[in-house]
Amino acid sequence: MEVKTFAFLQIAVIIALGLHLAPAGSNQLSGPQSSANSNDAVFCDTNCTQGTDGAWSGCRGDCFCVHVGNSTEGRCIELIGDFDYSTPGAED
C-alpha cells in the first residue's frame, strides 16, 4: 500500500513540475515566426485565367496568379515582405 501511495505522489510531483515549467519560456519575439520577420500574402482585386496557350493573365502590378489543381481559373495575390527569390549561384 505504501509503495502505491509513494508512486502516486512521485507522479503527482512530476506532473506539477511539468505544468509549472512549461510556460516558463521567454516572452521576447524571436525566431522565424516572430512578427518582426513576418510576411503577408494579400489578395488582389482581380481574378486570373489560363489561356489556351497555357499562359496566365489577369494579374497586374506585383500580383501573381495562384490556382488549385488543374483549374483554369485562379486568384491574384501579392506577397508583402522581405522575400529572396535569387537563384543560388546566380551571382558567380
UniProtKB/Swiss-Prot annotation:
Keyword Lipid biosynthesis among record annotations: no
Signal peptide start and end residues: 1-24
Keyword Disulfide bond set for record: yes
Protein keywords: Disulfide bond, Glycoprotein, Secreted, Signal
Main localization (coarse): secreted
Gene Ontology molecular-function annotations: C-X-C chemokine binding
Residues bearing attached sugar chains per UniProt: 47, 70
Origin superkingdom: Eukaryota
Subcellular location: Secreted
Any one GO CC term of the record: extracellular region
S-S bridge residues: 44-63, 48-65, 59-76
Function: Salivary chemokine-binding protein which binds to host chemokines CXCL1, CXCL2, CXCL3, CXCL4, CXCL5, CXCL6, CXCL10, CXCL11 and CXCL13.
Protein name: Evasin P675
Lineage: Eukaryota, Metazoa, Ecdysozoa, Arthropoda, Chelicerata
